[in-house]
């Protein structure tokens, strides 16, 4: 007998044939999809039947670029705007980031990260990435990963090693010391849902660039993938200062970083000849659309698609994209490509081939199937097919903000251009219902919010961070508004 049978749904499978059942079913048994198809082929018996009339059943989303502790900094963009120089903005935020995270031990980090995970689950994410590089408190990563385990989500979690002039001494460590921590965390948290890997924050965070080679070798020794935040906001200036005339992909290759499978965050400012290499590598990319509005460069997603690469999509945490909604992210991805194409045309480049312009279908594929591939989880999730894990969501389109559908002919467009996080009704991971009617089944949401608020208030008081916050308190004025 089937455990859960979802009936009368508009089913987007993301399977090899990209089948869409306009009135279909999904059956789950023992945490896996038992069948998916038309209603006439639905199993007759099930322990639980969910009538999904008016809802879309589809694979869960994957947030493929994230920093879980940075949920603590939501609305920081309001403090620092306008951002006209991204490298300078990054330097300024690191100062605040290390001030706060120096007081985030395991227990505190767990409470902060729970809130971020709760937000993501309610948005429809079933898997997340993490690059944890704030390791002044050595058990901070434990707290973050414990929260992921507790949430029921899947995670591709990179414990990063950083050093160099931009890093406080207390946060700096060698590749060898970092790999010891990674191995400890892998032993503690690796499971069928969580994979912990070594991480390279990016090429600018190493006192000794050879540490990148050491991390690759360490990953190989422990049978692990490697995480690289592949972005160069300096647009080649850092590499030129080091006497390297190539691009960042070539720079990483020179240290052996790409000798095995890697997660590659952002892939920002790759050279044209580097795009041509992508089809020859097992490098899985995540794009972050909101950042490309910060610097005005747009997203060159068409260059990835031209090489047969379907990237995932990431938010880069609430410090960057305050709104974690995957629907908002998909919209911004399409708009960011438009921004990039306009820039490239002004530079004399050709427009993309028609097949490489983004559509609603393409960004939905990126946010689900592409995300699972980017996080090395496409063998278990990313599509609805028999034998895969029961990782799926129900999105309620029977609402004013997502109507009319014109007899379902605009459903993909509604998902991308109109849906909100509040459209997500139900979230399953491995067949377990983690969100039901928009609410968590594992956590008391009010307690999660209150715990995070209290921890952050305590840290702000201990560090003086409260003085860095906008003075929007009674008796104060700020930006010509008076607070009483």
Roles of regions detected by a PLM:
Residues 72-109, 164-175, 233-261, 332-360:
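Active-site gating loops and adjacent loop-to-helix segments of metal-dependent hydrolytic enzymes
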Residues 389-449:
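C-terminal cap of metal-dependent C-N hydrolases
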Residues 76-131, 136-153, 178-191, 453-455, ...:
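Alpha-helical scaffold segments that flank or form the walls of functional sites
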Residues 1-44, 55-56, 477-483:
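N-terminal metal-binding scaffold of metallo-dependent hydrolase/deaminase domains
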Residues 134, 139-273:
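Metal-coordinating catalytic core of metallo-dependent amide/deamination hydrolases
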Residues 254-261, 301-399:
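His/Asp/Glu-enriched, well-ordered alpha-helical/loop segment
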Residues 9, 26, 31, 54, ...:
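Divalent metal-coordination and catalytic microenvironments
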């Amino acid at each position: 007998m089937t455990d859960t049978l979802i009936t009368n749904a508009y089913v987007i499978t993301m399977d090899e044939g990209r089948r869409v059942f306009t009135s279909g079913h999904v059956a789950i048994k023992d945490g896996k999809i038992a069948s998916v198809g038309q209603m006439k082929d639905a199993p007759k018996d099930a322990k639980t039947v969910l009538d999904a009339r008016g809802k879309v059943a589809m694979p869960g989303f994957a947030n493929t670029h994230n920093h879980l502790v940075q949920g603590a900094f939501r609305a920081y963009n309001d403090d620092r705007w306008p951002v006209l120089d991204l490298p300078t903005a990054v330097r300024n935020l690191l100062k605040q980031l290390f001030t706060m995270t120096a007081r985030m031990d395991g227990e505190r980090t767990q409470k902060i990260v729970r809130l971020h995970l709760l937000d993501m689950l309610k948005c429809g994410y079933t898997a997340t990435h993490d690059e944890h590089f704030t390791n002044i408190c050595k058990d901070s990563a434990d707290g973050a990963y414990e929260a992921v385990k507790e949430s029921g989500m899947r995670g591709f979690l990179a414990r990063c090693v950083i050093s160099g002039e931009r890093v406080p001494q207390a946060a700096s460590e060698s590749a060898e010391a970092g790999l010891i921590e990674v191995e400890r965390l892998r032993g503690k948290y690796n499971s069928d849902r969580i994979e912990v890997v070594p991480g390279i924050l990016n090429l600018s965070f190493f006192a000794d660039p050879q540490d990148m080679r050491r991390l690759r070798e360490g990953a190989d020794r422990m049978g692990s993938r490697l995480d690289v935040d592949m972005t160069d906001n300096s647009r080649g200036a850092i590499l030129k200062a080091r006497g390297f005339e190539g691009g960042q992909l070539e720079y990483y290759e020179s240290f052996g970083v790409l000798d095995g499978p890697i997660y590659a965050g952002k892939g920002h400012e790759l050279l044209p000849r580097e795009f041509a290499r992508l089809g020859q590598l097992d490098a899985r990319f995540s794009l972050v659309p909101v950042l490309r509005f910060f610097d005005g460069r747009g997203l060159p997603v068409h260059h990835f698609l031209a090489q047969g690469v379907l990237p995932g999509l990431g938010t880069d945490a609430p410090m960057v994209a305050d709104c974690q909604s995957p629907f908002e992210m998909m919209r911004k991805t399409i708009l960011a490509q438009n921004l990039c194409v306009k820039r490239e045309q002004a530079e004399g480049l050709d427009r993309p081939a028609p097949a490489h312009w983004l559509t609603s279908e393409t960004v939905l594929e990126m946010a689900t199937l592409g995300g699972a591939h980017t996080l090395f989880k496409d063998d278990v999730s990313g599509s609805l097919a028999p034998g895969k894990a029961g990782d799926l969501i129900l999105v309620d389109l029977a609402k004013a903000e997502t109507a009319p559908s014109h007899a379902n002919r605009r459903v993909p467009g509604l998902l991308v251009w109109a849906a909100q996080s509040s459209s997500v009704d139900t979230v399953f991971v491995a067949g377990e219902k983690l969100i039901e009617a928009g609410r968590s089944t594992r956590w008391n949401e009010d307690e999660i919010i209150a715990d995070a608020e209290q921890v952050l208030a305590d840290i702000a008081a201990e560090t003086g961070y409260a003085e860095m916050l906008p003075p929007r308190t009674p008796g104060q004025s700020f930006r010509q508004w008076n607070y009483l």
